[in-house]
Regions:
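A beta-strand edge to alpha-helix "cap/lid" segment located at domain peripheries
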Residues: 1-28, 33-122
Length: 122
């Protein structure tokens, strides 16, 4: 399996684990240095991000993937993914967003990990 295929599968797995609130997998696929930059500009480190998923501050219901692009350079990669994401976040109502995420990833010991993400709409 190519790195590009592994990373694309990791992206899809990430959404599945967000919907299922699977803390163990979320912890495994995000590097300890991970930071999510929300559309508002808020920076959320890994522990806070996963905690918000688990406590319902970030509620994800479904994700329909519309496409992604992966560029690998050695042991780092960039993934840009577009998905229609149904969620209720930060106390707002349930809504479907056209969410674009740009991820930085690193590879260590043969596995890929998300290190940084920036959210926007498309």
């Amino acid at each position: 399996m190519t790195d590009e295929v592994q990373i694309t599968q990791l992206y899809q797995e990430m959404y599945t684990t967000m919907v299922n609130k699977d803390r163990a997998v979320l912890e495994r696929i995000h590097d300890d240095s991970f930071v999510l930059v929300h559309m508002t500009g808020m920076h959320q480190p890994k522990a806070s991000y996963i905690g918000a998923i688990m406590n319902g501050t970030l509620n994800y219901y479904a994700a329909e993937h519309e496409g992604s692009h992966v560029a690998v350079r050695g042991d780092t990669a960039i993934l840009s993914g577009r998905s229609r994401v149904t969620a209720a976040v930060f106390g707002g109502g349930k809504h479907t967003w056209r969410l674009q995420l740009r991820f930085d990833l690193k590879q260590k010991d043969g596995a890929w990990y998300f290190t940084h993400a920036e959210a926007s709409t498309y």
